[in-house]
Amino acid sequence: MSRQLYPIDILGEHKVSSDFLVVELKRDRASDAVVGQTLRYMGWIKEHLCYSTQDVTGCIIAQQKDDKLDYALRQLNTVQFMRFEVDFRLIL
């Protein structure tokens, strides 16, 4: 099956190496379930978009991660976690 069934939040391509980066965004806390989701997207990209010289990495971005996600990511060198902060103020 070559049709992608789920939308990827952000798909980037490196300017020099042409490697792909799959970015999965989570609004609040990310758990280990997001690892499977990210790996599924990465697998699809590797199978359907990559040339033999291209690699795919993943990045999960959320405000927090739980312990389960931390343990799962320790076993993967192709997926990383990054935390974001938002400071939003309306000023009149």
Task: Name these PLM-found stretches.
Residues M1-L92:
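Charged, terminal alpha-helix-loop-beta segments
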